[in-house]
């Protein structure tokens, strides 16, 4: 019975995620093979550029270990009480990050299921509304967060892979 209940909850969650993603015209994941190559910088600059052109843009900070988007947007330390409402930066730009809901700036030390659960909760509960673009800033590599996003955000998602010319970054 528990297994069946678990499957029903998962199907409900996936249905809600699909519904949330259906109002977003373009989904773009920003990824890399290693850290420190400029993913978050590109995510913020791309989002700002699109929003300045009049597009409605959201940034999802999916890097649970190093959530830099709030820092780069100048909203570090802001605390939200409602997971479903993204933080409004300006008329056309909003963001959400797990760091808005954590009690401190201590690093997160979570195993795969905890990370996947947090990502799924964000995807399920954040109500972006109608967006032209959702920019998803991923952590480095192809770990649990990246796989969870890839499996749940939907068909037609575009990817930008950021790298530097060093062998270790390729």
Locations of regions flagged by a protein language model:
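Conserved catalytic-core segment of NTP-binding enzymes
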Residues: 125-128, 132-133, 139-170
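Walker A/P-loop phosphate-binding motif and the immediately C-terminal alpha-helix
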Residues: 27-64
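Short, ordered loop/turn segments at secondary-structure junctions
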Residues: 35, 62-64, 100-101, 140-141, ...
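Extreme N-terminal, non-catalytic leader segments
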Residues: 1-37, 78
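Predominant activation on well-ordered alpha-helical scaffold segments within soluble catalytic domains
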Residues: 44-47, 51, 70, 116, ...
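Conserved, well-folded catalytic cores of nucleic-acid-processing
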Residues: 27, 31, 53, 72-76, ...
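Short glycine/serine/threonine-rich phosphate/pyrophosphate-binding segments
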Residues: 39-45, 66-70, 141-146, 169-170
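Phosphate-binding loop that captures ATP/GTP phosphates
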Residues: 56-58, 62-109, 116-121
């Amino acid at each position: 019975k528990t297994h069946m209940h678990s499957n029903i909850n998962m199907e409900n969650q996936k249905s809600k995620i699909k519904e949330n993603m259906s109002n977003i015209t373009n989904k773009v994941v920003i990824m890399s093979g290693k850290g420190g190559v400029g993913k978050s910088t590109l995510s913020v600059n791309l989002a700002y550029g699109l929003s300045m052109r009049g597009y409605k843009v959201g940034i999802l900070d999916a890097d649970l270990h190093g959530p830099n988007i709030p820092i780069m947007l100048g909203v570090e330390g802001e605390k939200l009480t409602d997971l479903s409402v993204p933080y409004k930066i300006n008329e056309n730009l909003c963001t959400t990050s797990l760091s808005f809901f954590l009690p401190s700036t201590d690093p997160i030390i979570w195993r795969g299921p905890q990370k996947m659960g947090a990502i799924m909760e964000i995807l399920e509960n954040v109500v972006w509304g109608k967006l032209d673009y959702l920019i998803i800033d991923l952590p480095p590599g192809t770990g649990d967060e990246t796989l969870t996003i890839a499996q749940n955000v939907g068909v037609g998602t575009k990817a930008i892979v950021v790298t530097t010319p060093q062998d270790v970054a390729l």
